[in-house]
Swiss-Prot record:
PROSITE patterns from the UniProt entry: ATPASE_C
Residues annotated as site: Reversibly protonated during proton transport: E53
Alphabetized UniProt keyword annotations: ATP synthesis, Cell membrane, CF(0), Hydrogen ion transport, Ion transport, Lipid-binding, Membrane, Transmembrane, Transmembrane helix, Transport
Assembly and oligomerization: F-type ATPases have 2 components, F(1) - the catalytic core - and F(0) - the membrane proton channel. F(1) has five subunits: alpha(3), beta(3), gamma(1), delta(1), epsilon(1). F(0) has three main subunits: a(1), b(2) and c(10-14). The alpha and beta chains form an alternating ring which encloses part of the gamma chain. F(1) is attached to F(0) by a central stalk formed by the gamma and epsilon chains, while a peripheral stalk is formed by the delta and b chains.
UniProt GO cellular component terms: plasma membrane; proton-transporting ATP synthase complex; proton-transporting two-sector ATPase complex, proton-transporting domain
InterPro entries, sorted: ATP_synth_csu_bac/chlpt (IPR005953), ATP_synth_F0_csu (IPR000454), ATP_synth_F0_csu_DDCD_BS (IPR020537), ATP_synth_F0_csu_sf (IPR038662), ATPase_proteolipid_c-like_dom (IPR002379), F/V-ATP_Csub_sf (IPR035921)
Protein name: ATP synthase subunit c
NCBIfam families: ATP_synt_c
Keyword Membrane on entry: yes
A GO molecular function held by the record: lipid binding
Organism field: Caldicellulosiruptor saccharolyticus (strain ATCC 43494 / DSM 8903 / Tp8T 6331)
Length: 70
C-alpha cells in the first residue's frame, strides 16, 4: 500500500515536467520574437523553473519517506 502511495506522490513529477516543457517552449518563442528581451526573459524563466522543480523535489522526498516508513 505504501508503494502505491509513493507512486501517487510521484505523479507531481508528471505535472512539473509538462509545466516546465511548456514554459521552456514559451520562453524560446518569446526570445525568437523579441531577441532584445533575452536578458529579461531568461532570469524569469529560471526562477519559474526552480519554483516548479521544488514541487517535484518535495514529492520525491515524500515518496522516499513513505517507502522507508519514516
Amino acid at each position: 500500500m505504501t508503494a502505491l502511495a509513493a507512486g501517487i506522490a510521484m505523479l507531481a513529477g508528471l505535472g512539473v515536467g509538462i509545466g516546465i516543457g511548456i514554459a521552456t517552449a514559451k520562453a524560446a518563442e518569446s526570445v525568437g520574437r523579441q531577441p532584445e528581451a533575452y536578458g529579461r526573459i531568461l532570469p524569469l524563466f529560471f526562477i519559474g523553473a526552480a519554483l516548479a522543480e521544488a514541487v517535484a523535489i518535495y514529492s520525491f522526498v515524500i515518496a522516499i519517506l513513505l517507502v522507508l516508513k519514516v
